[in-house]
């Protein structure tokens, strides 16, 4: 298969590239096609099954001078300051370049152990295509991934906040495992706590079978109020 890739880092010897797990984890061989159509072999660094993102690397010794001169390291923007009505550009894996406006930044995607902010746009998009969302400064603000996207009734592009994904990306880039608990949860705010007479904290909506949370006895409906005697806020 094929998916979008973003060059995160150039450490002098390798290019570190962010891509999708579903197009690399079962591949016998990995290759990257750069902007000038040059192809080079790549190696897996690490992936996260929960979010579906992966980090791969390409040895710069495999690239010619023209390719090195044509590529650039992406700058990750702050998706927390993206507002409704902002102009954005979508780059999809099929080389399509699409423009549009942000229509919402208030939606969330619930995943195991975390909730991720979603940027919704008015850009028409094929849900089978992955891509990246950038602002008018050329900064990456969101990722549109095949296996990690909210189910929308319309066919407009949605992207998961790059700021929310950054902690996962940093761990994968260093080759570290992403901690895994195995719960789908939501925050119990003070307003919700007062309305339903439950404590503030993290409300567990679902526990994955045989996960660390399941083994420890956590159940759907529980509210986590503290971890290691530290209050959850």
Predicted segment positions?
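Gly/Ser-rich catalytic serine loop of serine hydrolases
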Residues: 3-4, 73-79, 118-136, 205-215
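Gly/Ser-enriched beta-turn/beta-hairpin loop segments
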Residues: 49-51, 62-68, 104-119, 171-178, ...
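Flexible, gly/ser-rich surface segments that form the specificity/activation loops bordering the active-site cleft
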Residues: 74-114, 149-152, 169-172
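C-terminal cap/linker of serine protease catalytic domains
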Residues: 140-196
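A conserved glycine-rich beta-strand in the N-terminal activation segment of trypsin-fold
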Residues: 1-16, 38-41, 75, 130-131, ...
């Amino acid at each position: 298969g094929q998916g979008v890739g973003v060059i995160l880092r150039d450490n002098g010897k390798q290019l570190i590239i962010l891509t999708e797990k579903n197009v690399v984890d079962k591949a016998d061989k990995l290759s990257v096609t750069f902007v000038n159509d040059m192809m080079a072999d790549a190696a897996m660094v690490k992936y996260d099954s929960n979010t579906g993102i992966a980090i791969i690397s390409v040895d710069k010794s495999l690239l010619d001078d023209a390719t090195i001169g044509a590529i650039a390291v992406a700058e990750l923007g702050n998706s927390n300051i993206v507002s409704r009505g902002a102009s954005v550009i979508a780059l999809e894996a099929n080389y399509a370049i699409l423009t549009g406006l942000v229509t919402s930044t208030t939606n969330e995607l619930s995943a195991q152990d975390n909730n991720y902010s979603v940027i919704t746009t008015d850009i028409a998009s094929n849900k089978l295509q992955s891509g990246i969302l950038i602002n008018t400064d050329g900064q990456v603000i969101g990722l549109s991934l095949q296996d990690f996207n909210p189910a929308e009734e319309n066919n407009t592009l949605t992207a998961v906040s790059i700021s929310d994904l950054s902690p996962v990306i940093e761990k994968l880039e260093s080759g570290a495992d992403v901690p895994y608990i195995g719960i789908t949860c939501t925050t119990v705010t003070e307003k919700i706590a007062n309305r339903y007479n439950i404590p503030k904290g993290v409300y567990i909506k679902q526990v994955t079978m045989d996960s660390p949370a399941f083994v420890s006895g956590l159940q759907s409906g529980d509210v986590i109020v503290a971890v290691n005697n530290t209050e959850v806020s």
